């Protein structure tokens, strides 16, 4: 694009035009017209006969207050005026500027940039790296130069793809890499504030560092709250080997609150102890003043000053004068409005100024070279430039990018000024020591990383040679595989030997067991006339059902008996009579695998697997024999009396056994009352676990179960294909719920529904409605019924685990252990004549004590909180938007205590607080606590009451003040008891604090303000804040208040406060406040007259006592 041809070229055009006039008019008139035109042209100002070049300064000036502090309008005007006055620039064109606002959201920022197409001839910007590449491509398309100091995108260095883009400052990444290389800090973390511009900056910084081969561990964004900052810093702390943390946000030194709070949070987490170095990214974009420049934020914030000891500030060196000095000089010359103070301006002002000069110098070079100022030509002629910027000498390299010298600034714990330590030479890309060492926390910098991270053309693996690392890993892998293979071979060999030999053999034959006729001999008790007729539905997974008959003395064989003696103990054999089991060698190999999986299952409530029996074509599982039979047998035997303690003991045994199985990652899959056996000590044990694994071991397919057998199966398993019903953890919980129903009603599953099993199964498969047993409430405690319903929930994920079931079940018995023997003894004692009376009497006493305990608890805590604590629930902190707080104390309490005996002080407080407690009972208020003579009451919590809280507290305060007016101390009746009262309304957070003697406490600024209202009040006065007065006036209930005036509240400044002096319809007398002295003050203790009267009376009493 051609913007001008020079003054001489324009004059040539004028001459050509007037030569044509000579051909059409007379000589005299032509000469006259020629002179007139020549004089007119020469008298025109420069701006008329030169072409303008308008520079658009793009940035988030309207939506970011800290960017707007750079005063882009003032900086651009100052630069443009100086350029247009500078005779060294080509005068064939003039410069203008326009301030273009960039939206703080990236998508909108790009859209607004496109709309700026016709508004400028070239652009300084963008400021947001999120759309720098898109803006550069648009600039190329528009043939308009893009000159940016903020685009960190390393892709823009490609001049072929982006010929119209140029940096007015060195790439911040080059500066960072130079510093990181010098200190050997390779591992970096990047954290940004949550504004779009900084989030994109952080991502581009991380990408650029990674393009240099440096490991960036984390790239995080933090919010403004401390919780978000703490979480982000903890993630950095957990990341591996991070040395340097780059903070992409506004610097705390120029008003960036996010960075200030972030550093304070890092200080609290002890991350500023020298483990990490923090680098503010934005300081790389401008020249931060440091010579004789104290920073108030460091002086006023000791925590930040300590944290800043771990910060290295890298900024553009101000070689000639500081930014503030240059700004002050320009203001003194009238170039900048006088009302602007230099410390209110961001140093980014100088960067904007320098960028405009950058474009002007490039334009000047292009026009002198070839008279053309296209965008690509401007970028090309910005190479190897040198000009004076706002407060330093500016140069460019052979690529047209700015070259500036940088300085590393540091501080220490004693100062709030920054001082120079190193300079960063960007031409040589090295650091030069400036004479003052860096003060690192702990006396030394963070640990250095391996040098290979900064070696070009070399892949770094944390300092370990890749070939060596691969060789070590391969050697270790081969060794580990060899050891595991050898160990596995030895173990398999030992297991095979143990299968049939030695004391731990698991594959038994007829030589190892002796089948017996199932009658009890002397070992099991005198039951010679009883024998067992035992049937076993093995393939269906059904455990033995025991029936009794007399006189059965048939000889026992493996064919007609399931009971045998093995090593002196009775065992039960669960037979598998179907299928082709193969030869003994095949059985050995498969039995070893399954037994290895099941042999370690040892628990009091698990029936242990003793081995496998294989002989004469029969295979069986060998387990301990339980003489009481299955749980189903006990439930159907009406001769066995079961109270709830007995039932809960059996259920608890079942829970313990299943909990153990699930902890070992074992799914039962066939849990039912028939698979729960009870031994002679009435201990329930779970059996038939691992049934599916045994079927697989024997290569048997599962036979279809009868409908009655499926009543314990979970609905989701019923809907599954028959071959895939291998069970699940949630399915076992459902089966347990059905067993609970059996135990509660002493009946079969779904016995109360009076439907055939086929119909029940169909309804279970196809809800809605959800079909479950109905258990009357009188059969079990409500808590137990509720647990049962949770366990058979339709959604499997909603069912509790056995750990949760165990924890709930323990609470049903108040933590007492269930014991079958104790239960039987208690059943026998119930026949005693006085047992019922004794139980009733004890129950009544327990209920009375319970009521006393609950009453005491509700006096200490709010009823709702107390109820939650009784249920074992956690009381979460609760926020209240608006409550009213009451604080009062006794005026002169210290003096009264000094003149009284300790017991008299206790009596005084007890009498006074008893009076107060009686008064607050008639108001909707909650007594929070008493500490010494301080009395604290709240309304609006824990039960919310709308806007009534202010009225309730005000009414209570008037009642208390009235009652105190007539209150007399027993030991000092002549000394009046004066109180001062403070009221304030606002938000609070309430919660229970502590485990031992828990307290219901209030937190928030409202509590502090209410306390300040009391402490700045006067005797016999109710001191009320503006917030409370506003609520009382809105209620329109006739409260009478008078303005006290502006009152100094500690930590709050001066606020307008009021006195509450009464209420329409309140007829009780109020005490007269003491008079105010001539200085407007009143005594905050006892008056000398009152003290003297008391001492005189005390002396008289002492004299009376001493008389004989």
Curated annotation (Swiss-Prot):
There are 9 conserved cysteine residues in sensory guanylate cyclases, 6 in the extracellular domain, which may be involved in intra- or interchain disulfide bonds. It comes from the Eukaryota. Residues 532-812 form the Protein kinase domain. Retina. Localized exclusively in the outer nuclear layer and inner segments of the rod and cone photoreceptor cells. It is an enzyme of class 4 (lyase). Pfam families: ANF_receptor, Guanylate_cyc, HNOBA, PK_Tyr_Ser-Thr. It catalyses: GTP = 3',5'-cyclic GMP + diphosphate. This is Retinal guanylyl cyclase 2. Residues 491-1108 are cytoplasmic. It is a single-pass type I membrane protein. GO terms for biological process: cGMP biosynthetic process; cGMP-mediated signaling; detection of light stimulus involved in visual perception; receptor guanylyl cyclase signaling pathway; regulation of opsin-mediated signaling pathway; visual perception. The gene is GUCY2F. Responsible for the synthesis of cyclic GMP (cGMP) in rods and cones of photoreceptors. Plays an essential role in phototransduction, by mediating cGMP replenishment. May also participate in the trafficking of membrane-asociated proteins to the photoreceptor outer segment membrane. Its EC number is 4.6.1.2. Residues 884-1014 form the Guanylate cyclase domain. Activated by GUCA1B when free calcium ions concentration is low, and inhibited by GUCA1B when free calcium ions concentration is high. Inhibited by RD3. Disulfide bonds join 104-132. The chain crosses the membrane at residues 468-490. It comes from Homo sapiens (Human). Residues 51-467 are extracellular. It is found in: Photoreceptor outer segment membrane. GO terms for molecular function: ATP binding; GTP binding; guanylate cyclase activity; identical protein binding; peptide receptor activity; protein kinase activity; protein-containing complex binding; signaling receptor activity.
């Amino acid at each position: 694009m051609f913007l001008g041809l020079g003054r001489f070229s324009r004059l040539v055009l004028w001459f050509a035009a007037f030569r044509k006039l000579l051909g059409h008019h007379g000589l005299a008139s032509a000469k006259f017209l020629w002179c007139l035109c020549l004089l007119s042209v020469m008298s025109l100002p420069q701006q008329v006969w030169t072409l303008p070049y308008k520079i658009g300064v793009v940035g988030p000036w309207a939506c970011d207050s800290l960017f707007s502090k750079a005063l882009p309008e003032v900086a651009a005007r100052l630069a443009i005026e100086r350029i247009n006055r500078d005779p060294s620039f080509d005068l064939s064109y003039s410069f203008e500027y326009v301030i273009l606002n960039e939206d703080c959201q990236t998508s909108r920022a790009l859209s607004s940039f496109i709309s700026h197409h016709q508004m400028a001839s070239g652009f300084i910007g963008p400021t947001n790296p999120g759309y720098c590449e898109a803006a550069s491509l648009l600039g190329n398309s528009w043939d308009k130069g893009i000159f940016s100091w903020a685009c960190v995108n390393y892709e823009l260095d490609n001049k072929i793809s982006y010929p119209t883009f140029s940096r007015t400052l060195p790439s911040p990444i080059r500066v960072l890499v130079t510093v990181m290389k010098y200190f050997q800090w390779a591992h970096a973390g990047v954290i940004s504030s949550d504004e779009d511009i900084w989030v994109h900056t952080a991502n581009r910084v991380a990408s650029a560092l990674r393009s240099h081969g440096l490991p960036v561990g984390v790239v995080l964004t933090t919010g403004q709250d401390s919780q978000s900052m703490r979480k982000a810093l903890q993630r950095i702390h957990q990341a591996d080997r991070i040395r340097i943390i780059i903070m992409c946000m506004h610097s705390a030194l120029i008003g960036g609150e996010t960075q200030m709070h972030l550093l304070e949070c890092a200080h609290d987490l002890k991350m500023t102890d020298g483990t990490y170095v923090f680098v503010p990214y934005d300081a790389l974009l401008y020249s931060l003043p440091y010579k004789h420049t104290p920073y108030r934020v460091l002086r006023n914030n000791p925590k930040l000053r300590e944290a800043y000891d771990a910060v290295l500030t890298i900024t553009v060196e101000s070689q000639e004068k500081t930014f503030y000095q240059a700004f002050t000089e320009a203001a003194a010359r009238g170039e900048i409005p006088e009302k602007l103070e230099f410390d209110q301006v961001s140093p980014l002002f100088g960067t904007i100024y320098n960028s405009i000069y950058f474009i002007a110098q490039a334009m000047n070079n292009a026009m002198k070279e070839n008279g053309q100022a296209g965008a690509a030509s401007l970028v090309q002629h910005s190479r190897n430039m040198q000009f004076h910027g706002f407060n330093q000498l500016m140069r460019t390299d052979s690529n047209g990018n700015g070259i500036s010298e940088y300085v590393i600034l540091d501080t220490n714990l004693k100062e709030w000024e920054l001082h120079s330590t190193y300079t960063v030479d960007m031409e040589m890309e090295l650091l030069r020591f400036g004479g003052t060492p860096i003060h690192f926390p702990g006396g030394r910098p963070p640990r250095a990383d391996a040098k290979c991270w900064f070696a070009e053309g070399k892949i770094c693996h944390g300092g370990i040679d890749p070939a060596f690392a691969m060789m070590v890993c391969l050697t270790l892998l081969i060794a580990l595989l060899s050891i595991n293979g050898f160990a596995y071979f030895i173990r398999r060999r030992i297991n095979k030997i143990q299968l049939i030999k030695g004391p731990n053999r698991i594959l038994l034959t007829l030589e190892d067991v002796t089948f017996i006729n199932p009658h009890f001999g002397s070992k099991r008790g005198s039951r010679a006339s009883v024998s067992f007729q035992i049937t076993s539905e093995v393939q269906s997974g059904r455990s033995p059902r025991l029936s009794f008959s007399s006189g059965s003395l048939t000889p026992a064989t493996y064919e007609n008996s399931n009971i045998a003696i093995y090593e002196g103990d009775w065992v039960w054999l669960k037979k598998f009579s179907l299928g082709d089991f193969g030869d003994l060698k095949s059985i050995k190999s498969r039995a070893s695998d399954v037994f290895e999986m099941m042999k370690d299952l040892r628990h009091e409530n698990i029936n242990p697997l003793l081995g496998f029996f294989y002989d004469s074509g029969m295979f069986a599982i060998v387990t301990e024999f339980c003489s009481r039979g299955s749980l189903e047998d006990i439930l159907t035997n009406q001769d066995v009396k079961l109270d709830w303690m007995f039932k809960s003991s059996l259920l608890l045994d079942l829970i313990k056994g299943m909990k153990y199985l699930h902890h070992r990652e074992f799914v039962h899959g066939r849990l039912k009352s028939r698979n729960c056996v009870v031994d002679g000590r009435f201990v329930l044990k779970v059996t038939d676990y691992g049934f599916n694994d045994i079927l697989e071991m024997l290569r048997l397919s599962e036979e279809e179960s009868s409908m009655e057998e499926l009543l314990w199966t979970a609905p989701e398993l019923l809907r599954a294909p028959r071959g895939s019903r291998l069970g699940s953890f949630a399915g076992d919980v459902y089966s347990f719920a059905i067993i609970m129903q059996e135990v509660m009603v002493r009946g079969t599953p779904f016995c109360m529904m009076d439907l055939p099993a086929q119909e029940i199964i169909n309804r279970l498969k196809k809800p809605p409605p959800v079909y479950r047993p109905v258990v009357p409430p009188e059969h079990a405690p409500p808590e137990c019924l509720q647990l049962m319903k949770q366990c058979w929930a339709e959604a499997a994920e909603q069912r509790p685990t056995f750990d949760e079931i165990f924890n709930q079940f323990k609470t049903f018995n108040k933590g007492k252990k269930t014991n079958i023997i104790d239960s039987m003894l208690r059943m026998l004692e119930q026949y005693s004549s006085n047992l019922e009376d004794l139980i009733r009497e004890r129950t009544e006493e327990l209920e009375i004590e319970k009521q006393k305990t609950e009453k005491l608890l509700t006096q200490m805590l709010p009823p709702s909180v107390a109820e939650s604590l009784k249920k074992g629930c956690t009381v979460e902190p609760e926020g209240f938007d608006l409550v009213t707080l009451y604080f009062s104390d006794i005026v002169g309490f210290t003096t009264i205590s000094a003149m009284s005996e300790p017991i008299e002080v206790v009596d005084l407080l007890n009498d006074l607080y008893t009076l107060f407690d009686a008064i607050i009972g008639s108001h909707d208020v909650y007594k929070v606590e008493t500490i010494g003579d301080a009395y604290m009451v709240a309304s609006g919590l824990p039960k919310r009451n709308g806007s009534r809280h202010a009225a309730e507290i005000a009414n209570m305060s008037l009642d208390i003040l009235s009652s105190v007016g007539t209150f007399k101390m027993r030991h000092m009746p002549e000394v009046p008891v004066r109180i001062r009262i403070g009221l304030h309304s606002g938000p609070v957070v309430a919660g229970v604090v502590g485990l031992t003697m828990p307290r219901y406490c209030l937190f928030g600024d409202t509590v502090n303000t209410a306390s300040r209202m009391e402490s700045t009040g006067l005797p016999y006065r109710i001191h009320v804040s503006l917030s409370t007065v506003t609520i009382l006036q809105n209620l329109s209930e006739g409260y009478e208040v008078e303005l006290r005036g502006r009152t100094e509240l500690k930590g709050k400044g001066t606020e307008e406060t009021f006195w509450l002096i009464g209420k329409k319809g309140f007829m009780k007398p109020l005490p007269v406040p003491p008079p105010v002295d001539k200085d407007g003050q009143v005594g905050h203790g006892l008056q000398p007259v009152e003290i003297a009267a008391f001492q005189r009376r005390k002396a008289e009493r002492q004299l009376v006592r001493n008389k004989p």
